[in-house]
């Protein structure tokens, strides 16, 4: 947000903060969310690069298309286990997954 807009909002009585502050998230919770989102993004990138539909991926991982959509959207109900297993099914190595997680905070 630009400085002028921030000053206008604060002058009008608004409090400016971060999502983390608003939701009261700890640094550990933020890191976990960022890791899951990075894994979700990697799944979508892999699916698209392999020209696969969500339905086709769902069949491959023995799940539903709606579950794949939730995985790609970063839905909090998606387990870390399913995200990692899906990347492994795509042929990702442990090193590949580690790199996704390592770069999740950048």
What are the functions of these language-model segments?
Residues 38-39, 63:
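Alpha-helix N-cap/N′ positions at the starts of helices
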Residues 48, 62, 73-75, 102:
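Residue-level detection of the helix-turn-helix DNA-binding "recognition helix"
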Residues 62, 79-97:
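DNA major-groove recognition helix of helix-turn-helix/homeodomain DNA-binding modules
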Residues 12, 41-56, 85:
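Short basic helix-loop element that most often maps to the first helix and adjoining turn
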Residues 70, 74, 85:
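Alpha-helical DNA-recognition elements
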Residues 50-70:
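Short alpha-helical DNA-recognition segment
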Residues 1-38, 98-106:
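N-terminal flexible/basic segments that precede or flank functional cores
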């Amino acid at each position: 947000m630009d400085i002028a807009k921030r000053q206008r909002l604060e002058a009008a009585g608004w409090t400016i903060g971060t999502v983390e502050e608003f939701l009261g998230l700890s640094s550990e919770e933020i890191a976990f969310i960022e890791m899951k989102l990075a894994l979700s993004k990697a799944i979508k990138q892999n699916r698209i690069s392999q020209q696969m539909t969500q339905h086709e991926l769902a069949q491959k991982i023995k799940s539903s298309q709606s579950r794949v959509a939730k995985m790609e959207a970063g839905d909090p109900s998606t387990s870390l286990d399913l995200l990692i297993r899906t990347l492994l099914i795509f042929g990702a190595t442990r090193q590949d997954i580690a790199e996704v997680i390592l770069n999740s905070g950048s």
